[in-house]
Structure formats: structure tokens, C-alpha cells
């Protein structure tokens, strides 16, 4: 590797909006990062996330327009 072209890799403190703090390594020179969500408060990691699947495109179409009778019944 060439010397002098890579940024310094230093220990960095990360502070979340929920108050959780942890230490990692980063190339950010200040050594301090503030984030809005982390693994302690993100819904995906806490299990509070709801997965909504209404059954696909056919079910969505039928819900919007309703089931119609075949053209032969008219």
C-alpha cells in the first residue's frame, strides 16, 4: 500500500438519540458521531416492527374493484 494516502483509523464514540453510546473505529477525525437510531431503539432490532403483506397484487386489485362476474353472465 502507498503510504500517506489513507486516512487515520481512530476509535470513535457513537451517541444515539435514545442515549445509548458505544465505541467503534472510524476515519472521522473528531472521534465523535451522533446518530438518530441504533440497534437498541430501531424497530427492526427491538421486534416492534410490523410486516404488512396484504396478499399480493391480485388481492389488492380485488379489494379495490371487488370481484366481478364473468362477461358471459351478463
From Swiss-Prot:
RNA-binding keyword on record: yes
Cofactor: binding comment: Binds 1 zinc ion per subunit.
A GO BP annotation: translation
Gene Ontology molecular function terms on file: metal ion binding; rRNA binding; structural constituent of ribosome
Function summary: Binds the 23S rRNA.
Summary of subunit composition and partner proteins: Part of the 50S ribosomal subunit.
Name of the protein this chain belongs to: Large ribosomal subunit protein bL31
Organism: Mycobacteroides abscessus (strain ATCC 19977 / DSM 44196 / CCUG 20993 / CIP 104536 / JCM 13569 / NCTC 13031 / TMC 1543 / L948)
Recorded GO CC terms: ribonucleoprotein complex; ribosome
Keyword annotations: Metal-binding, Ribonucleoprotein, Ribosomal protein, RNA-binding, rRNA-binding, Zinc
Residues where Zn(2+) binds: 16, 18, 38, 41
Similarity comment text for this entry: Belongs to the bacterial ribosomal protein bL31 family. Type A subfamily.
Pfam family, one: Ribosomal_L31
NCBIfam families noted in UniProt: L31 (TIGR00105), PRK00019.1 (NF000612), PRK00528.1 (NF001809)
Names of required cofactors: Zn(2+)
Highest taxon above the source species: Bacteria
